[in-house]
Amino acid sequence: MAWVQIRLNSTDKQAEQISDFLEEIGAVSVTFMDSQDTPIFEPLPGETRLWGNTDVVGLFDAETDMKAIVEALIASRLVEADFAHKIEQIEDKDWEREWMDNFHPMQFGKRLWICPSWREVPDSNAVNVMLDPGLAFGTGTHPTTALCLQWLDSLDLTGKTVIDFGCGSGILAIAALKLGAKQAIGIDIDPQAILASGNNAEANGVADRLQLFLAKDQPQDLQADVVVANILAGPLKELAPNIITLVKPQGDLGLSGILATQAESVCEAYAPDFNLDSVVEKEEWCRITGVKK
């Protein structure tokens, strides 16, 4: 049986309302997808957690009049009259197998691979991090994640301490440990991030070298040789005084989660304390790195 789907972008606050409405007008299923590869974690009891930038995907029978669906969405006032959307025909498939087949081991830099658990590692002599894409893991396909992983791979982390500020699923901290760091420290505002990072570290055999702190419990005198923060430009600027103090003198700093158009303002917040490298861009995103003065 064939299907037709509509995909539209929404905020986390409106996604559920749009989902309910699509089901009311005939959708056989509605799913939420992250549009920016941002980690999201298991909800607390009674809570639904969504990405701040969420794609809503409604699946309909192939005979459905999708023009009428679009008109109904506009009439509902849940979307703007000129809302961006994509409609496409979908063949009937083994969706679980299709989903698994879409995730392949990915290489970042010269040494580092991120591999889903159901795949054989391409190079047993490489640095392999085993992480499954899902609710608690950004897949690594987003440019900001890739930029940070490539940067970590380029460093000599042997014997060093690394802080992953805004650790999410712990992918950067775990990668740093696998790349030779002596110790890693993950910091996040979300308790679910701390739990996810711990579980992923356990699965990769590095939990004994990873310390995890909620931001409010971060030790006052905490410092590291390397600090990486893949969050957003706003928090990177607002939290610059805190992030700067985390880096030891002559230590390395890597920042991402930044649109290329935001790079200049983020650089201004860190330039007084760091000798900054040239900004590296990937698609519309960028990475800022430097060494503390």
Swiss-Prot record:
Subcellular location: Cytoplasm
Catalytic activity, as annotated: L-lysyl-[protein] + 3 S-adenosyl-L-methionine = N(6),N(6),N(6)-trimethyl-L-lysyl-[protein] + 3 S-adenosyl-L-homocysteine + 3 H(+)
Annotated Gene Ontology cellular component terms: cytosol
SUPFAM superfamilies: S-adenosyl-L-methionine-dependent methyltransferases
Function description: Methylates ribosomal protein L11.
Organism: Actinobacillus pleuropneumoniae serotype 3 (strain JL03)
GO biological process, one term: methylation
UniProt cross-references to HAMAP family, sorted A to Z: Methyltr_PrmA
Pfam short name (any one): PrmA
Top EC group: transferase
E.C. code: 2.1.1.-
Name assigned to this protein: Ribosomal protein L11 methyltransferase
Record carries keyword Cytoplasm: yes
